[in-house]
Amino acid sequence: MLREKIEELMKENERISLSTLATKLEVGYTEILRNSPTVKTYPVEKIDDLFQTLRGWEKVFLLVMTPGFVLEIKDKFPKGFYAHGFLNFHDIDSSIGGHLSVGKIKEIFLAKDVMFGRDSYSIKFYGEDEKEIFAIYVPRNEKKELIQKCLESFNSLMAI
């Protein structure tokens, strides 16, 4: 039922964003992610394969949102290792570092969306509280064009 409503609104307006769909349909954003034809769920148990793919990208656009701050980092996706219950990101070739509790990730979504009128492609990592932990976006070049090799890699993930 929800999927049909989403598809109907997308037919009416091909440029409608996922967040606008959530507002119009008065449902949570994660329900839109779970039911939109432009979003695919990625298996959490394959997260290491996903991170390996991301390390092959020229750079990533990492986004972390909190209620009072939006953190954006554009850099190579870092190498990491498991220790003390975390995936520890430490890589001299990347400014991205930190400690990820992989066990807290309950859903991963590959999403094609529209942001600020432009196509946007992201990998969203959600916790059991249905809140976004972080997201990785297909990066853009200095002309604000999507980096094609990264987009092709994203599309190959969508095809899995």
Regions from the language model: what does each represent?
Residues 1-132, 137-160:
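Eukaryotic intrinsically disordered, low-complexity regulatory linkers and tails enriched in Ser/Thr/Pro
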